[in-house]
């Protein structure tokens, strides 16, 4: 964060944030349980024009029209449905004439991570820091737990920690079924940690969804290559 410290909140806090946004604005309509499934596109002129979306509501498609449509799906689904070109997985070196990269695209994306928070619930609880090699953070601190000395750790004594959790592969992060499989796989990997924390007097707040690092990459007006980065080229 701006003060070089770590700040995070319990997963359920998003509900308070959403409520705060709705309360602050006079013209917001929130449609829960109505996932976007398609883009409404007009093909007039020399390019497609997105005029809204289709959502699934009560088992039926409902059209929502808008002068401006923003793809905030996180997966690039709406842009793809509107006909935008996109990439998925690692590119081959020859795709963009890069000097570094794979000879052939392997179609793989970065792995997914299931994060969680542990919180002390017993007065005699002792955090089992010895079982964690990396990936544990105190709130409002600069150092990882594993970087702290025993004295520093006991002095901070926050009693609540953010865990990077388990990392797993997902063969296709655009497919909700396969993402759910990865979610279950990550939960299984975390069971020993959950059990150890529970024995030590801690409860766990697991993230509502597995963290996806990479999905569709929508092609923009310019494709930034690895050589651009190496040469420190700036595009405005």
What is each of the regions a protein language model found here?
Residues 1-38, 110-116:
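Conserved N-terminal/central alpha/beta ligand/cofactor-binding core
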Residues 32-33, 45-52, 56-68, 72-234:
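Flavin (FAD/FMN)-binding glycine-rich loop and adjacent Rossmann-like elements that form
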């Amino acid at each position: 964060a701006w003060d070089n410290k770590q700040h995070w909140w319990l997963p359920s806090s998003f509900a308070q944030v959403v409520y705060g946004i709705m309360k602050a604005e006079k013209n917001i309509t929130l449609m829960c349980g109505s996932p976007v499934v398609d883009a409404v596109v007009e093909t007039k002129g020399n390019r497609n024009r997105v005029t809204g979306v289709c959502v699934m509501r009560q088992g039926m498609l409902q059209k929502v029209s808008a002068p401006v449509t923003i793809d905030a799906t996180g997966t690039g689904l709406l842009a793809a449905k509107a006909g935008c070109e996109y990439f998925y997985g690692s590119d081959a070196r020859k795709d963009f004439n890069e000097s570094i990269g794979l000879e052939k695209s392997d179609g793989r994306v970065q792995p997914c991570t299931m994060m969680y928070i542990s919180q002390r619930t017993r007065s005699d609880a002792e955090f089992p820091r010895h079982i964690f090699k990396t990936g544990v953070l105190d709130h409002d601190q600069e150092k990882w737990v594993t970087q702290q000395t025993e004295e520093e750790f006991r002095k901070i004594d926050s009693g609540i920690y953010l865990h990077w959790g388990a990392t797993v592969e997902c063969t296709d992060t655009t497919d909700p079924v396969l993402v759910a499989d990865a979610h279950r796989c990550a939960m299984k990997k975390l069971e020993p940690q959950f059990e150890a924390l529970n024995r030590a007097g801690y409860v766990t707040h697991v993230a509502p969804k597995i963290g996806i690092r990479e999905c569709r990459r929508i092609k923009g007006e310019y494709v930034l290559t690895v050589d651009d980065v190496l040469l420190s080229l700036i595009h405005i």
